[in-house]
Design a protein with these regions (language model features):
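Class I S-adenosyl-L-methionine-dependent methyltransferase module
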Residues: 147-148, 158
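Boundary at the C-terminal end of the N-terminal hydrophobic targeting segment
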Residues: 20-22, 224
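Positively charged n-region of N-terminal signal peptides that target proteins for export
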Residues: 1-4
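Short His/Asp/Glu-rich catalytic/ion-coordination signatures at enzyme active sites or charged loops
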Residues: 149-152, 197-208, 213-217, 356
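Sec-dependent signal peptide cleavage junction
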Residues: 23-27
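C-terminal capping alpha-helices of c-type cytochrome domains
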Residues: 154-201, 289-305, 309-320, 330-401
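Bacterial N-terminal signal peptides
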Residues: 6-19
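Short glycine/threonine-rich turn/loop motifs
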Residues: 29-141, 206-332, 336-339, 347-352, ...
Length: 401
């Protein structure tokens, strides 16, 4: 009999079974365990994570998650039928595309690196600049961005889901809607429900820190953890709690990335951006089609001068699988990332002083050996799996396996 891990969110119960391992990391990235070990991994697959937050107005059901999965992978929702959500958030590449910036329809490129969907359910806001508060809002944007899916509006998507027999039946089953009653909000809720099942804990670090297995990480990784907490000051933003670790404060910081090319022009850029925004400019489109506008960061959302060049702290979970790094994909390796911080947020080391740099960013004075230790620790944050969770139907109480 399968061993199941059950945890509740209000009336919703999630469960795990070996079937959840249908979406696994690339074999070159993560080794699959013997079948005899699978159940143990299933039982502990959320070690180190808190309960997944589920919106009251969008409860999880197996049918909704399955519908969201189909929508996430449907390439028809793009101007030329070549781009789906999974094009930039590939199941087999840790739900990223491993490119500096993503490639949309017709080979067009944007300005920002595609963050992993793994554990995105825990963020307090979505996108690098936090311009959407939740996964529902986030899921709508890429379809109508000119350098992503490229649709002129959401109407082509609604035409498909309202007329495709399989989608008609699924939306009727999940939301009890049909025809014009079926809106983009329903599409977004299904996609978001699917994305909330893409969670992964149980890394070697979790087994060491939360599971009490002192042999789960190497001595070098333990030294790196000490640096993470101490001299490296990483934990200031990539936070740890007593019973879980999201490795993000969900806040926004200017860490120096991307500022070299624009900092002398920031006053003019900020003024021009605000003028365009006040005249009805779409922030989503402006920041993904204009490299310089992109570097304004959180300012583009809040208009706050203190947030110029500030971007959201990403989780460090599974970071060894999601290269290249930073909001613009400009750093190729974890070692480059650590060196950037070691230099006080300056890359290259000869770059001019950044007046917008967040106050906590300063030289760390790490030795080469310490840099290697810290990188080794970051590699210990890789989960053995990042499965889709199995969801119990909150209306029937039955588990979907």
């Amino acid at each position: 009999m399968c061993r199941l891990l059950l945890f509740t969110f209000s009336t919703v119960v999630f469960s795990f079974s070996p079937a959840v391992f249908s979406q696994q990391p690339s074999p070159s990235a993560v080794n699959s365990p013997p079948a005899s070990e699978a159940n143990a991994l299933v039982v502990n697959s959320l070690l180190g994570l808190p309960a997944v937050p589920i919106p009251i107005n969008n409860p999880q059901t197996p049918a909704k998650v399955n519908l969201g999965d189909k929508l996430f992978h449907d390439k028809r929702f793009s101007i030329d039928g070549t781009i789906s959500c999974a094009s930039c958030h590939d199941d087999n590449q840790a739900f990223t595309d491993n490119l500096p910036v993503s490639v949309g329809h017709g080979g067009l490129t944007g300005t920002r690196n595609a963050p992993t969907v793994i554990n995105a359910a825990f963020y307090k806001s979505q996108f690098w600049d936090g311009r959407e508060p939740d996964l529902e809002g986030q899921s709508k944007g890429p379809f109508i961005n000119p350098v992503e899916a490229g649709l002129p509006s959401h109407e082509p998507i609604l035409e498909i889901v309202r007329t495709d027999p399989a989608y008609q039946a699924a939306f009727k089953d999940v939301f009890n809607v049909a025809g014009k009653q079926l809106t983009m909000d329903h599409v977004a809720k299904a996609i978001a429900s699917f994305e909330r099942t893409i969670v992964a804990g149980n890394s070697p670090f979790d087994r060491f820190y939360f599971g009490g297995d002192k042999n789960a990480i190497t001595e070098q990784q333990q030294r790196g953890f000490e640096l993470f907490l101490g001299q490296g000051r990483c934990v200031s933003c990539h936070t740890l709690e007593q019973d879980h670790a999201l490795f993000t404060d969900s806040r926004f910081h200017n860490i120096g990335i991307g500022m070299n090319a624009v900092q002398d022009d920031v006053p003019r850029l900020a003024e021009a951006f605000l003028a365009a925004k006040n005249q009805g400019g779409d922030v989503d489109k402006m920041v993904l089609t204009d490299k310089k506008a992109s570097e304004l960061g959180r300012f583009a959302v809040t208009d706050g001068l203190s947030e110029i060049g500030a971007f959201k702290t990403p989780t460090l979970r599974n970071v060894s699988l999601t290269a290249p790094y930073m909001h613009d994909g400009s750093l190729k390796t974890l070692k480059e990332v650590v060196i950037h911080y070691n230099n006080g947020g300056v890359t290259p080391a000869t770059a001019p002083v950044n007046p917008y740099l967040s106050g906590g960013i300063r030289p760390l004075n790490l030795l080469d050996k310490q840099i290697d230790d810290l990188v080794a620790f970051l590699e210990a944050l890789t989960s053995d799996y990042y499965p889709k969770t199995q969801v119990a139907d909150s209306q029937t109480g039955g588990r979907h396996e």
